[in-house]
Design a protein with these regions (language model features):
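Hydrophobic transmembrane alpha-helices and their helix-loop junctions in integral membrane proteins
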Residues: 1-3, 9-356
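Loop-to-transmembrane boundary segments
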Residues: 53, 58, 278, 358-369, ...
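Alpha-helical transmembrane segments
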Residues: 336, 407-417, 504-508
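Hydrophobic alpha-helical membrane-insertion segments
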Residues: 58-67, 286-293, 368-379, 447-455, ...
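Hydrophobic membrane-spanning alpha-helices of multi-pass integral membrane proteins
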Residues: 142, 178, 207, 285-289, ...
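Hard-cation-handling environments
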Residues: 351-408
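Aromatic-capped, Gly/Pro-kinked transmembrane alpha-helices
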Residues: 385-394, 419-513
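Alpha-helical transmembrane segments and their membrane-interface junctions
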Residues: 70, 290-306, 371-390, 459, ...
Length: 513
């Protein structure tokens, strides 16, 4: 958990690297654009605050769930001796308790991995340096949420508790949230025009796929043995996708940073003349795009085949809507990859000014990651997983989907414009208005909290500055009337008190004998 928190703090510091907010090139959104009367663009300092606030929201509930698990099971270990006995724990707290506990725990991974509706912080996090985006926001920080979910799933599987009713209910919710996030992220990536925001939207989509596929685990009995470990097929497929996504998306982010340096703009721009001048960037983009997009015969195709097989095999249990979301997200995803490639290297606006710095140093980094991404084609034939990926990939139906993805990729390369989305383009460019709604809700909550604390503060001030002094003043006036300094008067008071006490004592004796 300490490492988990360290990731959030690191991300906050790096997203806000240009905290002076003095360079529009580091902003996200069009400067001057408004949503509900509020700025639609985001500066680095505010993006950093948004990221840490969103992540801490989920971490707060996650920490509460961890504490509850520790108290109820007397263990905080996922694996090894003394690991949490999930079966006993779930039986103890019942279906509703299990679902509540898991949902509270998963709010941490959900916010960290930018699942809908906690996704906007990732999109505005693109104010940070591009190298930071390539590391934290494609391979490490955002993937940590998915990884923790995978570890949790494996731990529950090892305890034989994946079939618990509360687990089934919770994981069904996660399936649909993950796949819906995948579709929304893909649509956003297809429509927006900022290079890094496009890639952030696609990262959101990929994380949704990983979450959704992992959550299928309780509904499918297939497992695979790797060494001495028995792993649910769904978890393995999601983990392999995490690997190729990290390599391919890091490549695209690094290329994007080089493009921003070369063109002087964070928006899509570049034609084939730019591609000829930046050959390594162009080839690396193509390599990453076809690897990640699931076009055959690269690793992405076989892994997507595994996803199709996993989700389609449980359609009768989770509903065929999940499979429909997966197919739609995959189609839109490959279209965004082709559009990104085309608008920056083939059919985009001609670059009027090329700064020409960065050069070979930048090119070497993304050339290496692109080469490794292509090398992942060996994954389906290693690790003892051919039956998990190769068999589904050779199915005629899946081959047909792969061919369709190739056709879509080439078609969008030729005609990359998104005008066909019509009025929806504005919705996507404004990121589903989540930023504005969150700002309004959070601002309203903050204003209400501020007003409440102001009232409390005024009440405390009134108590100590007005009420108590007034009481002491009044009491002092009463005392002054009694304490006049005359001894004979004091003697009379004592005499009266003694007489009253004697009368009371006499009455008590008469009444009670």
């Amino acid at each position: 958990f300490i490492g988990w928190e360290g990731l959030g703090i690191s991300s906050w510091a790096l997203i806000g690297n240009w905290y002076k907010d003095d360079d529009e090139l580091t902003f996200v959104g069009k400067v001057g654009d408004l949503m509900f009367g509020r700025p639609a663009w985001t500066t680095p300092s505010y993006a950093a605050y948004r990221a840490i606030a969103t992540i801490r929201f989920g971490d707060m509930f996650m920490l509460g769930a961890i504490a509850a698990i520790g108290v109820l099971s007397h263990s905080l270990n996922f694996t090894g001796s003394g690991a949490v006995n999930w079966g006993s724990l779930f039986n103890m707290i019942g279906v509703a308790g299990t679902a509540a506990l898991l949902i509270l725990f998963l709010l941490g991974p959900f916010t960290k991995s930018a699942q809908f509706p906690f996704n906007d912080w990732l999109l505005t996090a693109m104010t940070g340096p591009t190298s930071v985006s390539a590391l934290l926001h494609s391979a490490t920080m955002v993937a940590a949420g998915v990884y923790i979910f995978m570890r949790l799933t494996l731990s529950i599987y090892d305890a034989g508790a994946l079939s618990a009713p509360g687990v089934l209910v919770t994981y069904l919710v996660v399936i649909y949230i993950g796949l819906l996030t995948a579709l929304l992220g893909s649509l956003l990536a297809l429509a927006v025009n900022e290079r890094k925001v496009i890639l952030a939207g696609s990262t959101m989509a990929s994380l949704g796929l990983m979450m959704g596929i992992t959550a299928v685990s309780p509904y499918i009995n297939s497992t695979v043995t790797i060494g001495s470990y028995i792993v649910p097929v769904a978890v393995l497929v999601a983990f392999l996708y995490l690997i190729i996504h990290a390599l391919s998306k890091a490549t695209l982010f690094l290329v994007s940073g080089h493009l921003i340096h070369e063109t002087g703009t964070r928006f899509n721009a570049g034609d084939f003349e730019l591609a000829k001048r930046m050959k390594l960037a162009f080839y690396s983009t193509i390599a990453a795009a076809i690897t990640l997009g699931g076009v055959p015969p690269l690793a992405g195709y076989w892994i997507h085949a595994g996803m199709d097989d996993v989700v389609s095999s449980v359609g009768q249990y989770v509903g065929w809507g999940a499979y429909a979301l997966l197919i739609l997200a995959s189609v839109v995803y490959v279209a965004f990859l082709a559009r990104f490639t085309s608008l920056n290297f083939i059919k985009g606006e001609r670059v009027k000014h090329v700064e020409g710095h960065g050069g070979l140093t930048m090119a070497i980094s993304y050339s290496i990651t692109a080469t490794v991404a292509l090398a992942t084609v060996a994954i389906p034939f290693t690790l003892g997983v051919p039956s998990v990926l190769i068999n589904p990939g050779l199915d005629a139906y899946v081959i047909g989907i792969g061919v369709v993805l190739w056709v879509i990729f080439i078609a969008v390369l030729i005609k990359p414009r998104s005008e066909s989305l019509g009025g929806l383009t504005n919705l996507f460019e404004r990121r589903y208005y989540i930023q504005a709604l969150m700002d309004i809700i959070l601002a309203g909550f903050g204003e209400a909290l501020s007003a409440f604390t102001y009232l409390i503060s005024r009440g405390i001030d009134a108590l100590f500055n007005d009420l108590l002094p007034s009481l002491f003043t009044g009491f002092s006036r009463i005392i002054r009337r009694v304490q006049v300094g005359l001894l004979d008067l004091y003697a009379r008071y004592i005499y009266i008190v003694v007489v009253v006490m004697l009368i009371i004592a006499l009455i008590l004796v008469i009444v009670y004998g």
